[in-house]
Amino acid sequence: MSNKGQLLQDPFLNALRREHVPVSIYLVNGIKLQGQIESFDQYVVLLRNTVTQMVYKHAISTIVPGRAVNFSTGEGDEPAAA
């Protein structure tokens, strides 16, 4: 994964995890999953609802937060809003 991808993905996912923001995750096959981000790494996201599911990032099309979340990209910019 490129550094630019990590500069955006990691702070965004970490803010969602840290603030317990409910999310909808749309997979490339059209399935919609809902829950909260429990954890993530380079390849997977753990999504918690009634159970915890491991979702591979390559299967994810879109992550939609249930509310606005502020996160910093770590580049000295103002916090980015999602």
Curated annotation (Swiss-Prot):
Q: Name one Pfam family in it.
A: Hfq
Query: Keywords, A to Z?
Result: RNA-binding, Stress response
RNA-binding among keywords: yes
- What molecular function does GO assign, one term? RNA binding
Q: Does the keyword RNA-binding apply?
A: yes
Query: By its UniProt entry, which InterPro entries does this protein fall under?
Result: Hfq (IPR005001), LSM_dom_sf (IPR010920), Sm (IPR047575)
Q: Which PROSITE patterns match?
A: SM (PS52002)
* Any Gene Ontology CC annotation: cytosol
The cross-references to CDD domains, in alphabetical order and at most eight, read:
Hfq
Stretches assigned to the Sm domain: 10-69
- Leader peptide range in chain numbering: none
Q: Which GO terms describe its biological process?
A: regulation of DNA-templated transcription; regulation of RNA stability; regulation of translation, ncRNA-mediated
PANTHER family attached to this UniProt entry: RNA-BINDING PROTEIN HFQ (PTHR34772:SF1)
Q: What does this protein do?
A: RNA chaperone that binds small regulatory RNA (sRNAs) and mRNAs to facilitate mRNA translational regulation in response to envelope stress, environmental stress and changes in metabolite concentrations. Also binds with high specificity to tRNAs.
The family assignment reads: Belongs to the Hfq family.
Quaternary data: Homohexamer.
Q: Which NCBIfam families match?
A: Hfq, PRK00395.1
User: What is the name attached to this protein's record?
Assistant: RNA-binding protein Hfq
Where does this protein come from, organism-wise? Albidiferax ferrireducens (strain ATCC BAA-621 / DSM 15236 / T118)
Starting at the broadest rank, the lineage of the source organism is: Bacteria, Pseudomonadati, Pseudomonadota, Betaproteobacteria, Burkholderiales
